[in-house]
């Protein structure tokens, strides 16, 4: 019998003694062998005996150990510490380290053998191997424990087939070893532990109601912090009696609110939180713990599920206001216009105080397009961080300062896994120009997407897996264990406030009813909904737990529910006659601004700048420090610009832009320009950030104009349109003093962010009363570069224009560009500006302005006259107005094509009139101009195909103007490219033929 018991032990010993022979250890053994060949005494005696028997050629061994000739020496650099060795599977290193520690302990008499005598060499080797096996088992729990955690409240999820990967037997331990104390060097907060003691901590930590994924993190400090925070005999999920009662109270509020609405408004859509009520106490914990750690503000973004609950129970929105909206009432005061939105899209803001720490909360309004609010929230948070710090220079804001504002995003499981903007936002999280010191992501994982099962909505085990790409820690938690959910929220908040990095909570829960309250989920998920109908609510389960603990009685719970219902009844009555008071959208940073209420008002703003100021700015724009080595081409660029400033003539597009930025910065307006390659400019035109050719140091002239100026930021963004544009829109919502610009690499690529244009930029003010002064610069122009580098799809933006919602412009002179940029900041309201910007005009000999056109009484012109009428020394002199036979109206670059062709042909009776601002349409100005030419033929000329460009938009406007002036020709004739499916041809010969054809049509 004794022999039989010894057999498994012997097998385990053999396994331990030969495990080094497995392929994964080959590199290590080769290195060890090379050491042995250099000096046999440098390795352990057992290795010495082993290598002595091999008898290999010493040179061959060294060569093999060194690896191929192209490998980099001493690379990769190894992280230090036995813990890290254990994490990367370098077990031989761990064994040596542990053996050394045990030898030291034995020498001091701290480590003794079974008989109480000092450890022998053999016992030290055995103890070290036990330690390694234990650490291997601990590592397995850290890596894979989450797969065995009790996460699904419904118990429908299949357990993975793990081949006993977490069993002690897998690591060479038998029940006979269970009473032996094993040295684990404080890895679980214990110096020595038995196998059962380890398992108790490991199962509780990694296989309970919380499953943690963190072993994909490469930073040892972050990894060690998580381990120390959750591992150990004293690290249980534990709450005080008061804490438990507070959790129960919030759960009763959350459940009671949903049930109350269900009774009062049967069948009305509310997208209830039923089944995910633990979210509410978790959000409270995030705000509370964050406030204790220095958090000042939380910017929330979330979808529809549970939104009304968050608004009322977390944000403190009066219940009577929500009931008023359910009744069909407006959420805005009577004197405020707006088209409105459904109640589960609306935003709100409030202040909450915990333990004397006041935290401001704001919930961002959003459309039904899932996850698109994420970048908007991040942008808002970034702007709030900048405002809090009060940035004046291009210095880095410490992440510890940024951490005072937290973006908190709530997601659905299917949307987090499915929507690409989620991955884009994760990609932004670590970038200098877009980081926000970590977003906290909370996934309400109800294990279904409308009617689609997870197996059909994602290819990964968890909805949160996409977050692993940025090494975010992920806390999976069972929503039916509110204490575990609140604990996970607490640890996640601490991680974010400590390391200023994103973190994810994935709360497994369920959706008690259909996608909305009029839906029947059993059509498509009969088994799931059978289980849900039989499943107790979170309040019932947690109430029973607290009753069992003797903390409350059933009567206490019933009384809490009744008191809450009574409060809601009172609010319901008040909601019948509720009237919203002053709306809050012009408070705080927006104080002093107003809503633009009259489309006919003067909207030019004071945009001119004195010549003296412009010259001072221009002088600074071309100065660089003495020891700064500028690229010689850039030096020529700066020299040319210096000449422009000296003479006041020949101001090109990029110079006008820099003067606009510089003058605004001097006046106290921060400039934030973001997009792909914006520092240099797609067309090598901007160069607002200079690089030293010897050490790559940066120098930004626009940040060195004068003391006390505002900051200029040019941010080369990641290669994304949707998230980056959403982010910049969000930034513009929080800081109306800042000129925020997003530039597309080519305007053609802007439609990658179409949702942001449609759902936010064009309609946000009408839906949610939220103004934005965002500028979108979209390079546009037909120059033979093919269908994807010609058109910003001007027609799309014009189609979105109505109700004075935004501005669309296609300007042709640097002066007008200067004024329209400054106009964004020089009025007491804000409107988005969509601008078609030039490519070939950046260096066109005619597309230049003078300093005089930027100063004095100059301003933005919505219409621009024919240069031949006002400029001296032109190739032709136009006839008097009465003799003009045709007026060709146009917008953008095509004006210069028409101008040069007319000059070439010597035509003097065709007038060219530019429409610089297409919306709001300058009807009155056009009436004034065109009344000069009542008898002339009217032509609209554009370079875009007929079904694109401004034609469809402008035709009815022009018809109205012609009727108004009683023109001889009541219809405008079209001249331009014929209708086309693709915006432009890819053949230069065809491009030139089309250009010649429509110029003939317009001028012939």
From Swiss-Prot:
Cofactor(s) the record lists: thiamine diphosphate
Segments traversing the membrane: none
GO molecular function: oxoglutarate dehydrogenase (succinyl-transferring) activity; thiamine pyrophosphate binding
Catalytic activity: N(6)-[(R)-lipoyl]-L-lysyl-[protein] + 2-oxoglutarate + H(+) = N(6)-[(R)-S(8)-succinyldihydrolipoyl]-L-lysyl-[protein] + CO2
Taxonomy, superkingdom: Bacteria
A GO BP entry: glycolytic process
Gene3D superfamilies named among the record's database cross-references: 3.40.50.12470, 3.40.50.970, Multifunctional 2-oxoglutarate metabolism enzyme, C-terminal domain, TPP helical domain
Keywords, sorted A to Z: Glycolysis, Oxidoreductase, Thiamine pyrophosphate
PANTHER family xrefs: 2-OXOADIPATE DEHYDROGENASE COMPLEX COMPONENT E1 (PTHR23152:SF4), 2-OXOGLUTARATE DEHYDROGENASE (PTHR23152)
Assembly mode: Homodimer. Part of the 2-oxoglutarate dehydrogenase (OGDH) complex composed of E1 (2-oxoglutarate dehydrogenase), E2 (dihydrolipoamide succinyltransferase) and E3 (dihydrolipoamide dehydrogenase); the complex contains multiple copies of the three enzymatic components (E1, E2 and E3).
HAMAP family: SucA_OdhA
UniProt protein name: 2-oxoglutarate dehydrogenase E1 component
Organism, as annotated: Brucella canis (strain ATCC 23365 / NCTC 10854 / RM-666)
């Amino acid at each position: 019998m004794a022999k039989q018991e010894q057999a498994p032990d012997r097998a385990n010993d053999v396994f331990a003694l030969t495990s080094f022979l497995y392929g994964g250890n080959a590199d290590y053994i080769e290195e060890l062998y090379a050491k042995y060949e250099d000096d046999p005494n440098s390795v352990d005696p057992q290795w010495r005996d082993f290598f002595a028997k091999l008898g290999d050629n010493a040179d061959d061994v060294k060569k093999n150990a060194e690896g191929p000739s192209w490998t980099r020496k001493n690379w990769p650099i190894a992280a230090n510490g036995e813990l890290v060795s254990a994490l990367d599977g370098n077990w031989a290193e761990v064994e040596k380290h542990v053996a050394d520690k045990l030898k030291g302990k034995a020498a001091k008499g701290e480590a003794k053998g079974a008989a109480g005598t000092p450890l022998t060499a053999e016992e030290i080797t055995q103890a070290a191997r036990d330690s390694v096996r234990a650490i291997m088992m601990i590592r397995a729990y850290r890596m894979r424990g989450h797969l065995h955690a009790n996460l699904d409240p419904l118990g429908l999820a299949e357990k993975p087939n793990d081949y006993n990967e977490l069993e002690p037997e897998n690591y060479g331990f038998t029940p006979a070893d269970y009473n032996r104390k094993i040295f684990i060097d404080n890895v679980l907060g214990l110096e020595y532990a038995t196998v059962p003691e380890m398992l108790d901590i490991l199962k509780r930590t990694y296989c309970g109601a919380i499953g943690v994924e963190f072993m994909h993190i490469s930073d040892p400090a972050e990894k060690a912090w998580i381990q120390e925070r959750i591992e150990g005999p004293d690290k249980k999920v534990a709450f005080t009696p008061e804490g438990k009662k507070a959790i129960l109270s919030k759960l009763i509020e959350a459940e009671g609110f949903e049930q109350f609405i269900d009774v009062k408004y049967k069948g009305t859509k509310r997208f209830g939180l039923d089944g995910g009520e633990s979210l509410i106490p978790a959000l409270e914990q995030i705000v509370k713990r964050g406030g204790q750690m220095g958090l000042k503000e939380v910017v929330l973004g979330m979808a529809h599920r549970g939104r009304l609950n968050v608004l009322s129970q977390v944000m403190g929105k009066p219940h009577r206001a929500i009931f008023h909206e359910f009744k069909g009432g407006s959420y805005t005061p009577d004197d405020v216009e707006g088209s409105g939105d459904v109640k589960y899209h609306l935003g709100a803001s409030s202040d909450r105080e915990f333990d004397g720490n006041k935290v401001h909360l704001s919930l961002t309004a959003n459309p039904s397009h899932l996850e698109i609010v994420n970048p908007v929230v991040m942008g808002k948070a970034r702007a709030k961080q900048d405002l809090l710090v009060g940035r004046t220079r291009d210095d880095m804001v410490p992440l510890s300062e940024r951490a005072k504002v937290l973006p908190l995003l709530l997601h659905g499981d299917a949307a987090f896994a499915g929507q690409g903007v989620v991955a884009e936002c994760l990609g932004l999280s670590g970038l200098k120009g877009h980081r926000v010191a970590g977003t906290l992501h909370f996934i309400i994982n109800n294990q279904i997407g409308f009617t689609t099962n997870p197996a059909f909505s994602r290819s990964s085990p968890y909805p949160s897996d996409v977050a692993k790409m940025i090494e975010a820690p992920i806390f999976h938690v069972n929503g039916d264990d509110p204490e575990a959910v609140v604990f996970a929220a607490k640890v996640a908040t601490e991680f974010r406030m400590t390391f200023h990095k994103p973190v994810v909570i994935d709360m497994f829960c369920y959706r008690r009813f259909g996608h909305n309250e009029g839906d029947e989920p059993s059509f498509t998920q009969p088994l799931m909904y059978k289980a849900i109908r039989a499943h107790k609510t979170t309040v019932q389960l947690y109430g029973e737990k607290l009753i069992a603990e003797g903390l409350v009685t059933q009567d206490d719970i019933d009384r809490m529910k009744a008191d809450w219902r009574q409060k809601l009844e009172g609010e319901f009555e008040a909601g019948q006659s509720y009237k919203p008071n002053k709306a809050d959208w012009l408070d705080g940073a927006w104080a002093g601004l107003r809503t633009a209420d009259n489309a006919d008002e003067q909207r030019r703003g004071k945009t001119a700048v004195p010549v003296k100021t412009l010259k001072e700015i221009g002088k600074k724009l071309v100065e660089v420090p003495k020891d700064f080595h500028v690229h010689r081409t850039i030096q020529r660029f700066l020299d040319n610009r210096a000449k422009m400033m000296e003479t006041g003539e020949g101001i090109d597009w990029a110079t006008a832009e820099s003067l606009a930025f510089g003058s605004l910065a001097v006046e106290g307006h921060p400039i934030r320009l973001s997009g792909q390659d914006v520092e240099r400019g797609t067309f090598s035109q901007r160069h607002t950030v200079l690089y030293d050719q010897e050490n790559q140091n940066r120098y930004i002239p626009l940040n060195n104009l004068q003391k006390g100026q505002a900051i200029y930021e040019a941010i080369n963004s990641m290669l994304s349109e949707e998230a980056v544009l959403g982010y910049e829109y969000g930034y513009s919502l929080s800081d109306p003093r800042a000129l925020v610009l997003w530039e597309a690499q080519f305007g053609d690529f802007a439609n990658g962010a179409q949702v942001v244009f449609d759902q936010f930029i064009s309609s946000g003010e009408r839906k949610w009363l939220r103004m934005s002064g965002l500028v979108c610069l979209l390079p546009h122009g037909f120059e033979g570069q093919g269908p994807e580098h010609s058109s910003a799809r001007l027609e799309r933006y014009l189609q979105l224009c109505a109700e004075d919602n935004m501005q669309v412009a296609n300007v042709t002179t640097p002066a007008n560009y200067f004024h329209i940029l400054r106009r964004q900041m020089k009025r007491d309201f804000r409107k988005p500006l969509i601008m078609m910007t030039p490519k070939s005009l950046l260096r066109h000999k005619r597309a230049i302005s003078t300093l005089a056109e930027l100063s004095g009484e100059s301003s933005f012109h919505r219409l621009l006259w024919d240069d031949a009428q006002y400029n001296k020394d032109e190739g032709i002199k136009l006839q008097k107005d009465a003799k003009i036979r045709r007026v060709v109206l146009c917008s953008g670059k095509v004006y210069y094509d028409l101008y040069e062709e007319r000059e070439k042909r010597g035509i003097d009776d065709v007038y060219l009139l530019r429409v610089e601002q297409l919306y709001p349409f300058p009807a009155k100005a056009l009436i004034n101009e065109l009344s000069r030419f009542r008898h002339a033929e009217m032509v609209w000329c554009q370079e875009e195909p007929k079904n694109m460009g401004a034609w469809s938009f402008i035709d009815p406007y022009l018809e109205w103007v012609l009727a108004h002036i009683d023109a001889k020709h009541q219809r405008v004739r079209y001249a331009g490219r014929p209708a086309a499916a693709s915006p432009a041809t890819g053949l230069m010969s065809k491009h030139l033929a089309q250009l010649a054809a429509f110029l003939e049509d317009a001028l012939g």
